[in-house]
């Protein structure tokens, strides 16, 4: 992967302190704490090995769902070079990501469920469980049944998830 940058040359997510780094995408984001969108390049045969899942009635699947699956088997070479210059639109996907996740709840829940089951730092595991429960409230099924997938985190997770869900609903309807 390479860096993405704004047209003014500023790296999205900030500058990095390596020239090259070989690790999987999960370690890159969660253990090394590298932020921001990157310009990932994958071999076609690897992407064919990990197709994007399709969910009935949904038009979006988080790229991270597929990229995390790839990360379980493959490393990426991360290179400190800006090759992709872009701007984020005020009404683009990034600006509307919460609404998109609410509307495409099956894909969102698959992403958070799989991430939770991976070997990730505990703080990230708690955040992931919160987001799983937050978006489970958007699911057109027995929501509490989904909550109890992770009962060990319930006392921490559920109240925060409910607060975030209420905030999401208020923001989406503004």
PLM segments and residue spans:
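Conserved nucleotide-sugar donor-binding catalytic segment
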Residues: 4-95
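Alpha-helix N-cap/helix-initiation sites
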Residues: 60, 123-126
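Catalytic core of nucleotide-sugar-dependent glycosyltransferases
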Residues: 71, 84-89, 96-122
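Generic structural signal for hydrophobic core residues of well-folded globular domains
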Residues: 74, 115, 136-140
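Preference for long, solvent-exposed alpha-helical segments and helix-linker "stalks"
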Residues: 78, 98-102, 128
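Structural register within alpha-helical repeat arrays
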Residues: 125-135
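Membrane-interface aromatic/basic loop that binds lipid-linked glycans or pyrophosphate carriers
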Residues: 137-174
């Amino acid at each position: 992967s390479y860096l993405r940058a704004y047209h003014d040359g500023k790296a999205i997510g900030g500058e990095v302190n390596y020239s090259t780094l070989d690790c999987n995408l999960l370690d890159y984001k969660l253990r090394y704490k590298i932020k921001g969108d990157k310009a990932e390049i994958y071999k076609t045969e690897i992407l064919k090995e990990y197709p994007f899942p399709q969910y009935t009635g949904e038009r979006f699947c988080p790229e991270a769902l597929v990229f995390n699956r790839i990360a379980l088997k493959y490393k990426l070479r991360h290179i400190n070079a800006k090759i992709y210059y872009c701007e984020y639109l005020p009404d683009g996907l990034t600006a509307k990501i919460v609404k998109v996740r609410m509307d495409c709840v099956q894909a969102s829940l698959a992403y958070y469920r799989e991430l939770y089951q991976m070997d990730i730092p505990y703080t990230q595991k708690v955040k992931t469980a919160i987001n799983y429960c937050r978006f489970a409230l958007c699911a057109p099924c027995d929501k509490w049944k989904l909550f109890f997938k992770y009962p060990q985190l319930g006392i921490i997770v559920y109240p925060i998830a409910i607060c975030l869900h209420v905030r999401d609903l208020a923001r989406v309807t503004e």
